[in-house]
Swiss-Prot record:
Bilayer-spanning residue ranges: none
SUPFAM superfamilies membership: DTD-like
Organism: Desulfovibrio desulfuricans (strain ATCC 27774 / DSM 6949 / MB)
Motif Gly-cisPro motif, important for rejection of L-amino acids location, chain numbering: 146-147
Any matching Pfam family: Tyr_Deacylase
Name of the protein in its database record: D-aminoacyl-tRNA deacylase
Gene3D superfamilies, per the entry: D-tyrosyl-tRNA(Tyr) deacylase
Family: Belongs to the DTD family.
């Protein structure tokens, strides 16, 4: 599982010209599942570990002396979270100029996995959680804050 975390002042997702999700200050995260995750990934500790890591990242400013430091989590800051499914996080560009996506998870199990991840994150933190639509051609807009962009990989963090 891979997550590209971006701290934003605002973000939104449109599908077919209609807004399906929007947030104010918080995190917009692109979420992808790989073949190495497999259809049972939601049963492994790394699945919940990634949800906890995302919700607990201290990438927001504190108060006073800590105003310019990464001090508070999304929940402490009172921000919002937008999760966007993104299979292209598993692009393989080693050969030629056209990326291969054979390392991306099979949509048959990756779609319910994404929906379950949204549910787990929503249940585990008190912030507003919104999401894009799996498999849709989405227009994603965001305004980076910082910018702050962080890469989370379940293999690197949890060994699975």
């Amino acid at each position: 599982m891979r997550i590209l975390v971006q701290r934003v002042t605002e973000a939104s997702v449109n599908v077919d010209g209609r807004q399906v999700a929007a947030i104010g200050p918080g995190i917009m995260a692109l979420v992808g599942f790989g073949q190495e995750d497999g259809p049972d990934f939601h049963n492994r500790p790394a699945f919940r570990g990634m949800a906890q890591k995302l919700a607990g990242l201290r990438i927001f400013p504190g108060q006073g002396e800590l105003a310019n430091k990464f001090h508070t989590s999304l929940e402490e800051f009172g921000g919002q979270l937008l999760l966007v499914p993104q299979f292209t996080l598993y692009a393989d560009c080693r050969k030629g100029r056209r990326p291969s996506f054979t390392d991306a998870g099979n949509p048959a199990w990756a779609e319910p996995m994404f929906e379950h991840f949204v549910k787990i994150v929503d249940e585990s933190c008190s912030v507003s959680v919104s999401s894009g639509i799996f498999g849709a051609d989405m227009a994603v807009r965001l305004c980076n804050w910082g910018p702050v962009t962080i890469w989370l990989d379940s293999l690197s963090l949890f060994g699975s």
